[in-house]
């Protein structure tokens, strides 16, 4: 007999009937209002580049966190760069050390619950500065 486990999210259910699998599911909502901005610049010179990504919390009550993805094209592909635990935390700082000067980066955020993810949020973009000098 085949069994399926569904996340503990309102509206998600699974059942097994005579060897067949019937699953009904709710949609895990992506976060909204995603924005990306250059991180703080220390006085006189940047020692590294950072980007701060913010969003509004998902409307899905069973979500447990977020995955932040980054790409160099608005249409992707996007690579997971960070995770955030808890749905009330709605920001993440990209301090991965992989950012380059004078480059536009695109970010999307997904809501998560267990191994399930929502669709991507709308895309936010930011262009890193041209030099190490702080404005």
Regions found by a protein language model. Name each.
Residues 92-120:
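Beta-strand-rich modules
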Residues 16-23, 112-135:
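Extracellular fibronectin type III
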Residues 7, 65, 104-108:
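Short, conserved beta-strand segments of beta-strand-rich sandwich/propeller modules, principally
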Residues 44-63, 94:
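Conserved aromatic anchor
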Residues 65-100:
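Recognizes extended acidic, P/S/T-rich segments that occur
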Residues 1-36, 40-41:
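Short, polar/proline-rich extracytoplasmic segments that appear immediately after membrane translocation
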Residues 18, 63-64:
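Short acidic/proline- and small/hydrophobic-mixed sequence motifs that coincide with surface turns
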Residues 13, 58, 110-114:
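Beta-strand-rich extracellular modules
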